[in-house]
Design a protein with these regions (language model features):
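RecB-family 4Fe-4S metal-dependent nuclease core
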Residues: 1, 45-47, 54-77, 99-435
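Extended hydrophobic/Leu-rich segments
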Residues: 19-27, 86, 112, 118, ...
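Intrinsically disordered, low-complexity intracellular terminal segments
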Residues: 78-85
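Charged, amphipathic alpha-helical linkers/stalks
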Residues: 85-98
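Conserved helicase C-terminal RecA-like lobe
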Residues: 1-39, 329
Length: 435
């Protein structure tokens, strides 16, 4: 128990007169001090600081002096460097602190042994994270798992573009999300989440254009969109598993406006192109995967291409719908954050045999516009065009596969910050809030 100095200063004579009254008063009034004193069985340990933070003497309170006058021979002054018996510690934490401070590691008490091991583990983690060269299992290099990871992600493993992009944006995120398969528990909320919104908007666009005879007839596109939105919004809560919130009507109105602008701009952007495939899968079910040759061997890929268009010359354009607008530029492919578009272009040509892709773009649904990256005009180093984009993606795939099999998962926040949906966002020591 800690008795500290109050606002009163009493001389010795006053204390002798009032000491019994003070203790009687403490016992009679409800409060933690009275409760503790009343509950004493055989022993009571009272403590107080005798030095302030600046080193000056800490004056005792009149409560302390009243108690001390009754037991003058029981007062001991303990200094920090004094060796004390561990059984006199007030808590397991204090006992462990004393043992470490006195360089006496516990050998008999199992509880203290486990606590000491836990503290030592934490010290090793902290040292690893403070080191100039960030290596070891606590900095994303669990090298003891190399053999296991190499077997799990062998040449027979089926990859998706999103998993590759996960490693490309932050290797630690891939490790937590895919290798460890950890998920952050989310509190139930009203309304849809990001994934549900993306699925809903993808389905609306796919159904809007799939049912059209002439995808260039803007009026027909608008009428098709209106009918599809009415059906999809009515079924969305049940189909995607969310509970509509009080703003659901307003959200439908906002999404409707965005989708109308989206299809109008998409029709204009698609002059000379005709949709020939929607939600085209490869590497799923009976459809063969994309077999990509890399320096790490053959890599098997699967995916869903949102839309494939063809022009009058029989050439292909690959479209990938995105709900958000982050990381849709040329530099995101160069950095390895976005690999989907060139991989899907290669999948359309090689796995599906649909023809020769000459263009590809991300389409931002909510903004109603194309992303900055266009495969036909992509340029990196001395390479130009769609083949340059495919080769850039191939190099990233090789780097990623090699890193995964070598158990290299350093936490590297992507440019612009980390996504809030990263499963490690609650505890990652390198987490930087971003998009």
């Amino acid at each position: 128990m800690l008795f500290t100095t109050g606002v009163y200063t009493l001389d010795r004579l006053q204390l002798l007169v009032f000491r019994k009254a003070v203790l009687t008063d403490l016992l009679s009034k409800p409060g933690p001090v009275g409760e503790v004193l009343a509950a004493v069985d055989s022993h009571l340990l009272l403590t107080r600081p005798y030095l302030a933070e600046g080193g000056e003497a800490w004056e005792a309170s009149h409560y302390w002096l009243a108690v001390a006058s009754l037991f003058p021979d029981s007062i001991q002054r303990v200094q920090g460097e004094d060796i004390r018996r561990l059984e006199n510690a007030a808590s397991p934490q204090e006992a462990l602190f004393w043992s470490v401070r006195q360089e006496r590691r516990p050998h008999k008490d199992e509880t203290l042994i486990r606590r000491a091991e836990f503290v030592e583990h934490g010290r090793q983690v902290l040292l690893a994270r403070l080191a100039n060269e960030r290596r070891g299992p606590y900095e994303g290099y669990p090298l003891e798992l190399q053999e296991q990871l190499a077997r799990r992600f062998s040449p027979a493993h089926m990859w998706s573009a999103s998993r590759l992009e996960s490693y490309g944006s932050c290797p630690q995120r891939f490790y937590v999300d895919n290798a460890l398969a950890l998920e952050a528990k989310q509190a139930p909320e009203l309304g849809f989440d990001v994934l549900q919104l993306g699925s809903m908007l993808h389905r609306i666009l796919e159904r809007t254009f799939r049912r059209l005879g002439d995808p260039h007839d803007l009026q027909a596109v608008q009428e098709s969109l209106s009918a599809v939105m009415e059906e999809e919004f009515a079924q969305a809560p049940q189909r995607y598993g969310f509970r509509p919130g009080p703003l659901w009507e307003a959200e439908q109105a906002d999404l409707s406006q965005r989708l109308v602008r989206c299809v109008e701009n998409l029709v204009q952007e698609s002059a000379g192109w005709t949709p020939v495939a929607f939600e085209q899968a490869f590497g799923i079910g009976a459809v063969a995967p994309l077999r990509m040759e890399t320096g790490s061997g053959v890599v098997l890929l699967r995916g869903f291409i949102d839309r494939v268009d063809r022009n009058a010359q029989g050439e292909l354009r690959v479209l990938d719908y995105k709900t958000g607008g982050s990381h849709l530029g040329k530099n995101d492919l160069i950095a390895g954050y976005r690999l989907q578009l060139p991989l899907y272009a290669l999948g359309a040509r090689q796995a599906l045999g649909l023809g020769e892709p000459v263009e590809g773009l991300y389409w931002n649904i909510r903004a109603g516009e194309a992303g900055a990256l266009k495969l036909a005009s992509f340029k990196h180093e001395e390479r130009l065009g769609i083949e340059a984009a495919i080769q850039t993606a191939r190099e990233h795939v090789e780097r990623i596969i090699s890193g995964v099999r070598a158990a290299q998962f350093p936490p590297i926040p992507p440019k612009g910050g980390c996504p809030s949906y990263c499963p490690a966002s609650a505890w990652c020591w390198r987490y930087e809030p971003g998009f």
